[in-house]
C-alpha cells in the first residue's frame, strides 16, 4: 500500500504529465521515484507536494515541482551522462538527475557533480542524498558554482538552478561539444530560461524559453552579492 506522500507525489506528477509539462517517460519515472518530502526541512514535509517553491534556509528555496520538471525536460539528460549542477540546494534536483543518468543506465555509468556555495546547505544536501540512497551517484562540492567544476569537465549536460546576469564563461568552456546547458538569465526579478547547445569548439546555439524567477547566482561570474 502506498503512503500518503507517495499518493500525493503521484497525483502531482500525473497532473503535470496530463497538462504537458512532463513529456518524456524518463522524467516522469524520475519524478515519481524521488521523495521530495525527504529534501525539505522537517517543518515543511507536509507541504512537500504543494507545487510551489519552499524555503530550505539561508535565503534559498527548493524549486516548485513543475519548474524542476520543465528544467529537466529542457536539459534532456540521457542515461550514462556526466552532469554538472550549479546550486545544489537541498539536493532534490540532483537526485532527479541521478535517477535518469545513473539509475536508468543499466551500467550505472552516469554521475552528477553539484556545486553549492553555502557549506551548511551542501551538508544538508549530502544528508538528504545519503538517506535516500543517491549519494553513490552524486558528488557534492562546496565552492563558487559560477566557475563550474573543471576537475571533471567536459560535461554532457550542465544545469544552473539560480539566476545569472549572463551565462558564466567557465560553464560554456566546460560543456562538451554536442552538450547542453540550461540556465535562467536576466535581472534579479525576472529571468528567461535559456538552453545553450555547444555545436562546435567555439560555436554555441542559444534558445530562449519561458520567463521564470530564481534566487540570484552569486559568484565571480554571477551576481556579486
UniProtKB/Swiss-Prot annotation:
Single GO BP term: methylation
Organism superkingdom: Archaea
Catalytic activity: [protein]-L-isoaspartate + S-adenosyl-L-methionine = [protein]-L-isoaspartate alpha-methyl ester + S-adenosyl-L-homocysteine
Active site, UniProt feature: 63
Signal peptide: none
Cellular component terms (Gene Ontology): cytoplasm
This protein's UniProt keywords: Cytoplasm, Methyltransferase, S-adenosyl-L-methionine, Transferase
GO molecular function: protein-L-isoaspartate (D-aspartate) O-methyltransferase activity
Pfam families: PCMT
Enzyme class: transferase
Broad class of where this protein is predominantly found: cytoplasm
HAMAP family noted in UniProt: PIMT
Family named by the database record: Belongs to the methyltransferase superfamily. L-isoaspartyl/D-aspartyl protein methyltransferase family.
UniProt-listed PANTHER family: PROTEIN-L-ISOASPARTATE O-METHYLTRANSFERASE (PTHR11579), PROTEIN-L-ISOASPARTATE(D-ASPARTATE) O-METHYLTRANSFERASE (PTHR11579:SF0)
Purpose of the protein: Catalyzes the methyl esterification of L-isoaspartyl residues in peptides and proteins that result from spontaneous decomposition of normal L-aspartyl and L-asparaginyl residues. It plays a role in the repair and/or degradation of damaged proteins.
Protein's recorded name: Protein-L-isoaspartate O-methyltransferase
Source species taxonomy: Archaea, Thermoproteota, Thermoprotei, Desulfurococcales, Desulfurococcaceae
